[in-house]
UniProtKB/Swiss-Prot annotation:
Gene3D superfamilies: Aldolase class I
Active site: 97
Source species taxonomy: Bacteria, Bacillati, Actinomycetota, Actinomycetes, Mycobacteriales
Function: Catalyzes the rearrangement of 1-deoxy-D-xylulose 5-phosphate (DXP) to produce the thiazole phosphate moiety of thiamine. Sulfur is provided by the thiocarboxylate moiety of the carrier protein ThiS. In vitro, sulfur can be provided by H(2)S.
Transmembrane segments: none
The UniProt record lists the keyword Oxidoreductase: no
Protein name as annotated: Thiazole synthase
GO CC terms, sorted: cytoplasm
Residues that hold 1-deoxy-D-xylulose 5-phosphate according to the record: 158, 184-185, 206-207
Keyword Acetylation among record annotations: no
Matches recorded under PANTHER family: THIAZOLE SYNTHASE (PTHR34266:SF2)
Cellular localisation: Cytoplasm
Subunit record text: Homotetramer. Forms heterodimers with either ThiH or ThiS.
Entries under InterPro entries matching the protein: Aldolase_TIM (IPR013785), Thiazole_synthase_ThiG (IPR033983), ThiG (IPR008867)
Length: 261
């Protein structure tokens, strides 16, 4: 069970809607992934791209998926705060994924603006899920500012490079008292599994599904990958060793010398 603030979800996979090739493919991918929480970028108008003019928000309502509006594209805390307020009024939700981007080339978080936005929105009654860098100190500052979940990147958005700094992700997980959701950079199922093995509570991804060759098949793979990583973490991996350790006992082993005698 993934618990964030006052809500719980069976699935530990959060899916994004950005980059989907078609409305129909998005719908089938959402179903295949098993996600119960899905991010949508807030804009001044909602795109109606379904066959019958159905919006993404109406699709999620039909599929019983909780929408998580985000502030994608915002460059300042002020813009992120305004976008969150518009989302609350439009969607009647106080949940918001806060992104404050430093520049359009790297799409890396501006952590100073992010912390400012997180604190202000938390004080205004929002449940903030904060997209951040893989810096453990920044993650702690966001938690101190009131974030209900911290969302460190594995690698820059859309790169598919996987988790470039697993040590830092594991360190963030070990120190956090709120859920840690790996966000950005996932390229394939093994990346999602690793995130959960490192101790993440969940994984958010969009491009890895929406921009791959077969999104529906990849959505299914990601569903199982996240669950596999979670179970592996709970089971506990064997310790790493410098030397080989036999898995079978040598007691009673037949040898040629014994047979000759």
């Amino acid at each position: 069970m993934l618990t964030i603030a006052d809500r719980s979800f069976q699935s530990h996979l959060i899916m994004g809607t950005g980059g989907a090739s078609s409305f129909d493919t998005l719908e089938k991918s959402l179903i295949a992934s098993g996600t119960e929480l899905t991010t949508v970028a807030m804009r001044r108008h909602a795109a109606h791209t379904g066959a019958h003019g159905e919006s993404v928000f109406e699709l999620m309502q039909r599929l019983n998926i909780t929408p998580l509006p985000n502030t994608a594209g915002c460059r300042t805390a002020r813009d992120a705060i305004l976008t969150a307020q518009l989302a609350r009024e439009a969607l009647d939700t106080s949940w918001i994924k806060v992104e404050v981007i430093a520049d359009d080339t790297t799409l890396l978080p501006d952590v100073l603006e992010l912390i400012d936005a997180t604190e202000t929105l938390t004080n205004d009654g929002f449940t903030v899920l904060a997209y951040t860098s893989d810096d453990p100190v920044v993650a702690q500052r966001l938690e101190d500012a009131g974030a209900a979940a911290v969302m460190p990147l594995g690698s820059p958005i859309g790169t598919g490079l996987g988790i470039l700094n697993p040590h830092n992700i594991e360190l963030i997980c070990s120190r956090a008292t709120v859920p840690v959701l790996l966000d950005a950079g996932i390229g394939t199922a093994s990346d999602a599994t690793l995130a959960m093995e490192l101790g993440c509570s969940g994984v958010l991804l969009a491009s890895a599904i929406n921009r791959c060759i077969n999104p529906i098949t990849m959505a299914t793979a990601m569903k199982h990958a996240v669950e596999a990583g979670r179970l592996a973490r709970e089971a506990g991996r064997i310790p790493r060793r410098e030397h080989a350790v036999a898995s079978s006992s040598f007691e009673g082993l037949a040898s040629w010398a014994d047979e000759v005698l």
